Amino acid sequence: MRECLVFAAGLLAFNAVAGPVNLNQVFKLRVGAETVRFNPVEDGDLRRLDRQVQVLLSKPEGESKHTRRGLEEIERLTENALNRPTPADRKQLEIDLVETVLAVNNNARPPIPRHFDAIMTPLALLQLFRPIGIGQKPAANLQPGPTDDLSRRDPLPSSFWSLPPDIATENLHDGFGRPGLPRIADKLCRYAAPKETTGMNPGFEVDCGQERVKLKFGEVSSEPLVTRMFWALGFHADPTDYAAGVKVAYDRRIFTEFNSRQPVRTTFTVLWFIPVYSMNLQRSKDPFAYVAAAVLRDGRHWSGPELKRRLMTGTNFLPAVEAQIDYVVTTPANVQVKDPLVKSIGPWDYGQLDHANRREVRGAGLLAAWLGFYDTRFDNTKLRVVGPKKHPRLEHYFSDLGGGLGRTKGLLSWHGENVNAFPWTFTAPPLDLGKGRLARPLRIVGYTPDVRTPAFAAMTIDDARWMARLIGQLRSDQIIQALTASGYDPATIHLYTQKLISRRNKMIADLGLAGEFPPLTLE
């Protein structure tokens, strides 16, 4: 089922185009049935945009909280741009405004086409071509510096990435600059809200003391590992941890709201309007399958299947049985403690605006390839407002990094969290056509993202070497720290460590950096 999803999602990514930001053009803000056209460099257009956004915000809340938050940010940015800032500040406000508008638009963008017609078959076949590292043009956002080796130049400061102060000294067990792991296992949490996104993996939110925590029953170990690596190398990623089980006070809504995820539907047609077949790719899950134990008030324990058998009569709950249950313990989950100062607006896309011309977004392709992270659909990213309301800033997050550490190449055969399927290498030496000329200096051969990813395709040898120098600073014990915190057993930790080191060493050699970074060994 997931293969159908990513194949269809690729059709939406097909038309993404890379290029520099041209702000002197008409953009469209789409909210429900409303479309607002504006040119961000024209004050008259900004005033009109501001008025229309105020009208949208004055209506009863019919839009999602993310869209409404985006409209509030558009209002703030527009008014600041009209308040006579310096030319440099005005340009940044215009860029932030357009980024926010596109993120709001992306909220209404379906993860797959709402219908697939036979006439789209050639386009679908083109989706099978998902290149990485075939770029020729240098990144457009490099800091000033020598031109003899562009791979040594960092990108200009941005909302996507910041230079890590000292990669080799980071504690990747706790990760994310924290003094320790969250102590969720020690708390009795209370059910708070269902998961209502389009994600395939079930989950829900709980309140654990003063913290709101997201539980996700899928990619329980790969996501904590991959997020730690992205964060360590300077990207914005949600602090994600492995939990062997979470104690949640009994609440009927755990079961009645478990399948609240949004449907993901597509209709197959011929001649564009004759329906042939409809499919909902969002499958319902049995909530009792994610209960490891139910703990009764008298101290007895029931398994998930036993709880279901005793608690339910058909689709009806038995109140007398409910009264006996103190709390449930979930199966392993990946958990994210929500930061009240980090709020989502909507997804950003690897191919929108100048994203594919940015060194840091291109370089993320090599990091993704090393870790086998393949799920690069646009809805696995988020543009977020960070900080207090009086001084907010925008940051681009890699928000769902779970698809990795498994089978990393194929037409429709990716599979994460599979140590035996995870290859030992993913690069090859430069291809020499003779006479001292290198036809293909960058060859990534063991990795393919699941959708066309323009920024990864645009990656050049210089972008790859830039990222490889960051990866090369990681120590083997840091890899072990991250794997241990991610809940893997000792044998799996050992094999993953060997493979990640092997992939790292081969990558360093194939990119011509062996003189800078000696081979890493398993300490």
Features from the language model and the residues they span:
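Regulatory N- and C-terminal appendages and interdomain linkers associated
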Residues: 17-191, 208-210, 473-523
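Bacterial N-terminal signal peptides
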Residues: 4-15
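Extracytoplasmic/periplasmic, Sec-exported soluble proteins
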Residues: 41, 66, 198, 218-222, ...
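Conserved kinase catalytic-core segment
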Residues: 220-223, 228, 337-419
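Second-shell loop/turn segments in exported
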Residues: 38, 211-219, 252-255, 349-356, ...
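C-terminal catalytic region of ATP-dependent kinase domains
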Residues: 27, 99-114, 388-523
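Conserved ATP-binding subdomain of kinase catalytic cores across diverse folds
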Residues: 175-335
